[in-house]
């Protein structure tokens, strides 16, 4: 009986699965625009969804889309106008979501 109980315990236990790893390249150093991402990382929301997210702030803010296009990152934060220009230049990029719904680019006089 003890052997059967042990067998059932091991076969009925939920399988442990490794988290999917991904790299998220920010558009600049960490700032308030990235609040939802940082909160999700700190509170463990990514981990709850089976994601192990590495967040990287670039040395050059123009690099993240290029790095994703080259396969050196999974997601990049960029600006919509820049995305249109990069696609026109032939980079294989696709917009998959919105972090900040209102553009933060403006001209002040």
Describe each region flagged by the PLM.
Residues 21-109:
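Short, glycine-/small- and polar/acidic-enriched structural segments
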Residues 13-15:
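N-terminal signal peptide c-region/cleavage motif recognized by signal peptidases
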Residues 1-5:
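Positively charged n-region of N-terminal signal peptides that target proteins for export
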């Amino acid at each position: 009986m003890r052997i059967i109980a042990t067998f059932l315990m091991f076969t009925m236990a939920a399988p442990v699965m490794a988290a999917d790893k991904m790299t998220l390249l920010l558009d600049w150093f960490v700032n308030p625009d990235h609040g939802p991402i940082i909160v999700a990382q700190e509170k463990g929301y990514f981990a709850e969804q089976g994601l192990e997210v590495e967040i990287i702030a670039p040395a050059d803010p123009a690099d993240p889309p290029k790095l994703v296009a080259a396969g050196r990152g999974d997601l990049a934060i960029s600006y919509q106008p820049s995305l249109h220009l990069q696609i026109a230049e032939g980079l294989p990029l696709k917009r998959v979501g919105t972090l900040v719904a209102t553009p933060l680019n403006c001209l002040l006089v």
